[in-house]
Regions:
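Expand to "…catalyze enediolate/carbanion chemistry for C-C bond making/breaking, isomerization
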Residues: 1-121
Length: 121
């Protein structure tokens, strides 16, 4: 489980893009705060950032013609079995959304994709 560097989102192959959507759904729901080495940094920020990152994924999916369940477009939605946020505070965000998504992380993501046989620029 990892969040791909947001600059890679438009280039992600279908399986990685759809997998990222599933991972974002899990993290936004009952997975919030559960330890996992590659995504622990996400929990040091507001859940709003994960929502904003997930929006990027969903926008890319929609642009490729995939259907996105509209519930996930609601910042407060956390899945069918997890209570929603009452009113998740919005934040002014920079790009990248996560400061951890720096040049070194970008290169790490590219290397991870290469290990899977996927070559991106």
């Amino acid at each position: 489980m990892r969040l791909w560097h947001e600059a890679l989102i438009p280039q992600l192959p279908r399986p990685q893009l759809l997998g990222q959507h599933r991972e974002c759904c899990a993290l936004r729901g009952n997975g919030w705060g559960r330890k996992h080495a590659t995504v622990d940094y996400v929990f040091t920020h507001s859940p709003y950032r994960l929502y904003a990152y997930h929006r990027l994924i969903m926008e890319e999916m929609a642009g490729r013609g995939y259907n996105v369940s509209p519930e996930w477009l609601d910042k407060n939605y956390r899945g069918k079995t997890c209570p929603p946020y009452q009113d998740l505070a919005e934040e002014k965000l920079n790009s990248p959304i996560y400061s951890e998504h720096d040049t070194a992380y970008y290169e790490e993501c590219l290397a991870n994709l290469r290990e899977k046989g996927i070559e991106l620029e």
